[in-house]
From Swiss-Prot:
This protein may have potential in cancer diagnosis and treatment. Glycans are attached at residues 26, 74, 118. This is D-galactose-binding lectin. GO terms for molecular function: galactose binding; peptidoglycan binding. Optimum pH is 9-10 for hemagglutinating activity. The activity is decreased by 25% at pH 6.0 and by 50% at pH 4.0. Oligomerizes in solution. D-galactose 3 binds at residues 108, 111, 127-129. The lineage of its organism: Eukaryota, Metazoa, Spiralia, Lophotrochozoa, Mollusca. D-galactose-binding lectin. Binds both alpha and beta anomer of galactose (Gal). Binds strongly to branched beta-Gal-terminated glycans and weakly to unbranched glycans with alpha-Gal on the end of chains. Has strong affinity for both Gal and GalNAc. Binds glycoproteins containing mucin-type chains. Has hemagglutinating activity towards human group A erythrocytes. Has hemagglutinating activity towards rabbit erythrocytes. Agglutinates V.proteolyticus bacteria. Thermally labile. Complete loss of hemagglutinating activity after incubation at 60 degrees Celsius for 30 minutes.
Length: 150
């Protein structure tokens, strides 16, 4: 299973559990931050050929929209939680560099900024634009994309 960092393409910041702990509690917000460390590594956990869980390696918790709804509202915070269900499934669109929730919305920096500050929350939103592009990169080389569906 490939380990990767989730990099906000426009700002170069990365997904982190808020507070940066290795075992954050259920419901911990996911934020963007410029630091790189082993507590912000992720992996895909395959469910079927398209949909996957995004797993926080250190805690083995899964990326979820807060509340775990099938069709989260625009602005719903992204969090880590231990539960695995179809409302926590995501797919990567490598052509457009976005992360799509099974309900159809995408992960965005809250506020839609191309250069969000450290600690900016990540949310679900239906809009598509350059500020919501993410790429998966190697923890050993933050400029090298990794093949995460292999």
């Amino acid at each position: 299973m490939t380990t990767f960092l989730i990099k906000h393409k426009a700002s170069g910041k990365y997904f982190h559990p808020k507070g940066g702990t290795s075992n954050p509690p259920n419901g911990t917000n996911l934020v963007l931050h410029s630091d790189i460390h082993e507590r912000m590594y992720f992996q895909f956990e395959v469910v079927n050929e398209r949909w996957r869980y995004i797993k926080h390696v250190a805690s083995e918790k899964i990326v979820h929209p807060f509340g775990g709804k099938a069709d989260p509202l625009n602005g719903t915070n992204m969090v880590l939680h231990q539960d695995r269900h179809d409302r926590a499934l995501f797919a990567m669109d490598f052509f457009n560099d976005n992360i799509r929730h099974k309900g159809g919305k995408y992960i965005h920096p809250k506020g839609g900024s191309k250069n969000p500050s450290n600690g900016n929350l990540t949310v679900m939103h239906g809009d598509e634009h350059g500020a919501m592009e993410f790429i998966f990169v190697s923890p050993k080389n933050k400029d090298k994309r990794v093949l995460v569906y292999a």
